[in-house]
């Protein structure tokens, strides 16, 4: 089972959409009753739902925020009544887009009541796989309190998987000037405490809506529609029986060659605007093509500027595994320079028999590409520009933070960027003696 946690305004909005999609796919109506048409919908329903005494299905979801607003709108939304009422945990003060408030002051006061609810949900599970957290990194609650919660859960359940869906701030779609601070402080935490981070980015989502879906003025609703489709795709092999049943751990084993490099780019195909799905049947070659297209990536980094360490594709619908494998091989052979050669067979694909609502087939792409450093680099530059002048710092030190923490977060993020760069440049045939010598020096320097 997976316990789902959503925090902050963004996390709650995305999370609410995610549950709408998942409920639709499993044939569960807003009151939690099942009205679907195939047993497959119920076969692994317990991954995300608890079955209550009267035959109702209740999401294993915890909703938290430091102000009541967003949660009220979730509660009054289409599926608001399906959640367990005790699982709404909220404060009144808000975090005011301040990471320190979410992580150290306001959030720290609320965290124990959130942990109680998480514990209750975890105790309800027979065999807990792990946790998935939806949050944004630009604000105060999702980033500050979200990372606080992740580190607390890490302490209490050290051997369970921790997956995050993290929305990174983007230069074009920004609501606060301190986003780079909040994001850097969060990444500092995610590198250490999360197992897998699915990186989403408003700018990239915005571009997809604008360019591919031809929406002239995309709303957050449209962006969240994309996110929820992708989240549903990433998790579909956990929710439905497929030929290759994956769980969070198998996903991690295939995708993470080095523990710190666990930030994934996501892609989705077919991208059609909401109204036009039914007109053309897509073929496996077409969705494979579209899925690998850099314009389809949900974060603002171009995979052609780096190399894939690993990648994984999840195809949904009735299709032959053979055809899928051929298409995937085809992509790798044509673009071999974009894959590191020192991890052979670094692309895996799985097929899940049940397509998303309204489509015959679809695919979701998860890639671990070194080009994601572009995004960290971008945030880091913005961070440095402000931090050099200590701009806005008093909001954080006023909550008891120390400048040292900023410096550490900054250097951790820069280390991450250079690690990605190092593996991007690495080849299979490098002179091994040199490497050993370097390692030897490094070890001695560190001592």
Swiss-Prot record:
Residues 427-440 have a biased composition (Acidic residues). Pfam families: Tubulin, Tubulin_C. InterPro entries: Beta_tubulin, Tub_FtsZ_C, Tubulin, Tubulin/FtsZ-like_C, Tubulin/FtsZ_2-layer-sand-dom, Tubulin/FtsZ_GTPase_sf, Tubulin_C, Tubulin_CS. Mg(2+) binds at residue 67. Residues 411-447 are annotated as: Disordered. One of its GO terms (cellular component) is microtubule. It is found in: Cytoplasm, Cytoskeleton. One of its GO terms (biological process) is microtubule-based process. Disulfide bonds: none annotated. Keywords: Cytoplasm, Cytoskeleton, GTP-binding, Magnesium, Metal-binding, Microtubule, Nucleotide-binding. GO terms for molecular function: GTP binding; GTPase activity; metal ion binding; structural constituent of cytoskeleton. Residues 411-425 have a biased composition (Polar residues). Its cofactor is Mg(2+). GTP binds at residues 9, 67, 136, 140-142, 202, 224. Belongs to the tubulin family. Dimer of alpha and beta chains. A typical microtubule is a hollow water-filled tube with an outer diameter of 25 nm and an inner diameter of 15 nM. Alpha-beta heterodimers associate head-to-tail to form protofilaments running lengthwise along the microtubule wall with the beta-tubulin subunit facing the microtubule plus end conferring a structural polarity. Microtubules usually have 13 protofilaments but different protofilament numbers can be found in some organisms and specialized cells. Tubulin is the major constituent of microtubules, a cylinder consisting of laterally associated linear protofilaments composed of alpha- and beta-tubulin heterodimers. Microtubules grow by the addition of GTP-tubulin dimers to the microtubule end, where a stabilizing cap forms. Below the cap, tubulin dimers are in GDP-bound state, owing to GTPase activity of alpha-tubulin. PANTHER family: TUBULIN (PTHR11588). This is Tubulin beta-2 chain. It comes from Pisum sativum (Garden pea). The gene is TUBB2.
